[in-house]
Amino acid sequence: MEVILLERVAKLGQMGETVNVRPGYARNFLLARGKALRATENNKKHFEAQRAQLEARNLERRNEAQTVAEKLDGQSFVLIRQSGETGVLYGSVSTRDLAEVVTKEGFSVERGQFVLNQPIKTLGLHTVPVTLHPEVEVKVTVNIARSPEEAERQARGESVTEREQFNLDDLGLEVGQALADAGEGADDRG
């Protein structure tokens, strides 16, 4: 299906371009979200008549996004979550959680603007891209920790998930002897 793009769409094209896409993608995403029009003769004429307005509106949105990007780029946000000793979270951190934390800090960012391929499931520092506008993208750092003290340690570069290394002999167990005893017991039964 041919559509006319009303704004820049990543990996597809710039505003005003006529592109050929699959019908489902056009109907369910591009047309539904107002990012494109069907490429009919009437729509082409309508688009050309309104092109200046659309470009002005796009430029205004990009400038607003650029202003927010200057303040947001490189910022670090702390999320406190419960996790096991190995650093694996009970649950995960999704775009909704990220949007809440960033909004509490005074930035206007929606959950759909965060680019996460999969939810975050471990403690530590994670760099997350934020697409404020199709032409403006910044990166923020999310510090996921079990407590504010741990977050400070992680920010300094310390690992909070180091497991203590131990040897079975240090525990007072004689592995060889335990196996030998188990083997003798098996002979007595049979």
From Swiss-Prot:
Signal sequence interval, chain numbering: none
One example GO MF annotation: rRNA binding
Superkingdom in the source lineage: Bacteria
Keywords for this protein: Ribonucleoprotein, Ribosomal protein, RNA-binding, rRNA-binding
Record flagged with keyword Membrane: no
GO BP field: translation
InterPro entries: Ribosomal_bL9, Ribosomal_bL9/RNase_H1_N, Ribosomal_bL9_bac/chp, Ribosomal_bL9_C, Ribosomal_bL9_C_sf, Ribosomal_bL9_N, Ribosomal_bL9_N_sf
Any one cellular-component term (Gene Ontology): ribosome
A Pfam family assignment: Ribosomal_L9_C
NCBIfam families with a match to the protein in the record: L9
Family designation: Belongs to the bacterial ribosomal protein bL9 family.
Function: Binds to the 23S rRNA.
Protein name per its UniProtKB record: Large ribosomal subunit protein bL9
Organism: Methylorubrum extorquens (strain PA1) (Methylobacterium extorquens)
Lineage: Bacteria, Pseudomonadati, Pseudomonadota, Alphaproteobacteria, Hyphomicrobiales
